[in-house]
Structures are given as structure tokens and as C-alpha cells.
């Protein structure tokens, strides 16, 4: 596995191990309808939440360094992706109205960036079926996330996790096909 692909896969592993630890420590988050960020507002889950998300951001930065300079769009996207994740971690929505606004702005920008990058990857891969399928799953989960933002009860966490799973799978699998075999 080439280094950029390995780094992005490690970022996904960090994200999901962190989320798994959060769910084990506080399973109520599955039904709270506050999304992934629910776990950033409790003392007992903040550390695995932060490690998971910041691990994903860190390995995205490592992937940037390992990508060829020719991969301008991917490098730029990851340069935006990593700080948005950091922004989500450092702006807990429960810390006041302005923090909530900042948190929501970072999260919305992240989802938008991920959808745009997914579309670009589909185009680069010439609309191969699995990339299009993962993009549609991501889009459907993004729509579900938007629907579940305001209700008291819903599946915001589950929709966000599905969105991130589809995006992460698309990103990692795409690099397998797009990067030259001799990549550093």
C-alpha cells in the first residue's frame, strides 16, 4: 500500500476506534440525536473523541506530504479537510451559541468539501460503479444528516457515521487506482 493511501486508512482507523470507544463509554449518544459531536461535550468521552478526530486530521496532513505535487486538487482538499476537523474538535457546540455556530460552520464546510471531493474523485475515476455508489451513499447520508439536525430524536450519529464511512472508503479506494505504482 502506498504511503498516502496508508496514511488516509490510518486516519479512518483512528476516527472509528475513537468513536467506538466513545460509544462504549457513553452509549446514550446513539439515541441523543446530537451526532458525532455529542461525544465532544462530555468529560469521559472527550479524549477518545479528540484522539479519533485529530488522528484523522493528522494522517490527512501526513498524506499531503506523501502525495506527489501533481495531485494539486487532492492536496488542496486535504489541506482544507484537516483544519476543519480540528475546528470541529475545538468548538464544542454545547459551549455557547457562538461556539455552536462555529462548530456548525466547520461541520457543514467539511461535509460540503467531502461531497465535492467525492464528485471530483468519481470524475477522475471515469464514473466507475463503486465510486458512484459510495458517492450516492454519502449523499443520502448527508441528506439524512441534514434532516436529523433539528429533531429531538433521530439518527444523526448514524447518518454522520455512514457519511464518513462512504467518504473514507471512496477516498482510500480511489487512491489505490489513481496513484502511480512508483509513488513515494
Where in this protein do the model-derived segments appear?
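Non-cytosolic membrane-interface motifs at loop->transmembrane helix junctions
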Residues: 37-41, 97-110, 154-163
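Terminal transmembrane helical module of multi-pass membrane proteins
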Residues: 125-184
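Hydrophobic cores of alpha-helical transmembrane segments in multi-pass inner/ER membrane proteins
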Residues: 13-19, 48-62, 110-121, 163-178
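Juxtamembrane "helix-exit" motif on the non-cytosolic side of transmembrane helices
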Residues: 24, 28, 67, 90-98, ...
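Membrane-interface helix-boundary motifs at transmembrane edges
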Residues: 1-6, 64-76, 122-131, 179-184
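Aromatic-anchored segments of alpha-helical transmembrane domains
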Residues: 19-23, 81-90, 137-148
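N-terminal topogenic module of multi-pass integral membrane proteins
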Residues: 1-68
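Membrane-proximal helix-loop-helix units in multi-pass membrane proteins
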Residues: 78-132
